[in-house]
Amino acid sequence: MQVYTIKYALIKKKYGDIDIVIGGPPCQGFSNANRQKNTAISQNNMLVRQYIRAILELDPKAFVMENVSMLKSEVHRFYLTREDVQIVEDYNIPVKETSLCLLESNFAFDGVLNIIQSYDQIVKYLWDEKHYSELNVVYKASKNLQKLPDVLKKHKKNLLEFAKAHINDSDDVILKADSEAFTAIMAYFSNECNIATIKDSIAEAIMYQRMLSKTKEIFDNDIVVERYETESGINAIIKSYAVYDYLKSILESEKHGYIIS
């Protein structure tokens, strides 16, 4: 059962008043990313929301939450969504502007802002997850030329199969980068490309896919973007608030009356 689907009202109906709730998000998962996918939204931080939901809906006399000290780190923040706006106002949760880097300046191009502000455009250019995962493994391995041949050999079958979907003669910046990346992969397997050139050949496509993935997350999670800045790459300026402040502001509010120590 997913924690998001638990109906705590049914638990209260079955067991009556709850004395204490014990739990907490997993400490080993507390990093801001699934770095394979370079995600913007930490699912482990999101588990904190679910734990607080459990407390509010079960209304226990007391609760024990593990790893609270880790939540005080600036690393653990929620991005403000449209759904959050009223909650932040009601509980006076402190927010600040946060810059989310979508694309480094050396990969920026004319028209990129129009793409990242259009969900249809994002979906149009975004690869199948399996395609990204395969090429991203190669990109990471390309930093070590001694290991790269083994990685390419291991993933050869999938890479050659996926290449069929990406090789094209388009002048579109993103599609052209896609094509160049997989053309280089095919050239390597045909002994027409030096392995040392692989990294540069696929970097652009990988960076565009990471940008698209992050911007899709912004749409999917209904995150409020204050503005986009282009002085140093492409950055989404969004508001965020500390996970710990969220926890403390809600649970210690007059409405709920808990004391966090």
Language-model features: locations:
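SAM cofactor-binding core of SAM-dependent methyltransferases
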Residues: M1-Y4
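Class I S-adenosyl-L-methionine
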Residues: L10-I18, Q28-S261
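Hydrophobic beta-strand segment of the Class I
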Residues: V21
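Glycine-rich, N-terminal phosphate-binding loop of Rossmann-like dinucleotide-binding domains
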Residues: P25
